[in-house]
Amino acid sequence: MKSIAIIGASGYTGAQITSLINADCNFSVQGLYVSENSLDKGRKLADLYPTYSHMAYTLSPLSDDAKKKIVAEADAVVLATEHSVSLELAAWFYQQGLAVFDLSGAYRFADVAQYPKWYGFEHTHPDVLAQAVYGLAEWNSEQIKQTRMIAVPGCYPTASLTALKPLKPFLTEMYPVINAVSGVTGAGRKAQLHTSFCEVSLTPYGVLGHRHQPEIATHLGQEVIFTPHLGNFKRGILATITVQLKPGTTEADVAKAYSVYDNAPIVTVKHNQFPKVDDVVNTPNCHLGWKYDANSGYLVVASAIDNLMKGAASQGLQCIKIHFGV
């Protein structure tokens, strides 16, 4: 049984992956940690999330002694921390010999030049970055097995890339257009005016400047137009994507392209049927639905996931299981 430490466990994704690991007979939770200045240190996870009342874990401060204890006892560490925090912690734990599964964006770009623009910091660990694998589980499983540094994808990129990557050989030079709506949990647990009950409303944000746009483009290998929206629901993502396919592409070609997921139990693909968020909430699943107009060459594909599950925690667990071969 592999032992997993979870850092940043007081947030939505940290608590979610704690629940998933706790329920998996292949793994044990070494401990839950928050920063030393966190107001949540010393509290029980169930005090923050009564839905997890069956788990008796306490949130410990990540002191130097705690880090040494993790290295001595754990096989892997999950980082559900801010990007700049993960930057340093991931490198330190990797250098101590642990497998690192980072839910932040600190290791998703291979190009160090991307980080100042999109994350506001210089990447100070290019040696560790060079070992990082992008943890899109259905596409990079062999690489995930071979490295100890896994950058778990963002929620919007997971929904978008799962829909688009099978179509890559058929895409024209026209940019795919991605319109995606996420539940409020995508903004995190900290109180903010725009996510409060009386203020939240369906609205676009990060227009032509969201950091997930270059993440999608980098791992698709093609530029995209990406517009995220805040939805007035708790969790889930629906991405509706319009693409132009090369002349001569047939419906049969598209169906064959999506057959790449025939042996991927988490991904369900339907032709001329479209998914809804409610069908994937609280599951690790991705539901895809597509329709193609061969006359115009345009295809619309919709992708639905739970932003806290396939968009973060359950994909993190997928990567852990792939890496350890369980």
Curated annotation (Swiss-Prot):
Keyword set, alphabetical order: Amino-acid biosynthesis, Arginine biosynthesis, Cytoplasm, NADP, Oxidoreductase
Record bears the keyword Cytoplasm: yes
Catalytic residue list: 155
Catalytic activity: N-acetyl-L-glutamate 5-semialdehyde + phosphate + NADP(+) = N-acetyl-L-glutamyl 5-phosphate + NADPH + H(+)
Signal peptide: none
GO MF, one annotated term: NAD binding
Top class in the EC scheme: oxidoreductase
Pathways per UniProt: Amino-acid biosynthesis; L-arginine biosynthesis; N(2)-acetyl-L-ornithine from L-glutamate: step 3/4
UniProt function note: Catalyzes the NADPH-dependent reduction of N-acetyl-5-glutamyl phosphate to yield N-acetyl-L-glutamate 5-semialdehyde.
Identification of the protein by name: N-acetyl-gamma-glutamyl-phosphate reductase
Gene assigned in the entry: argC
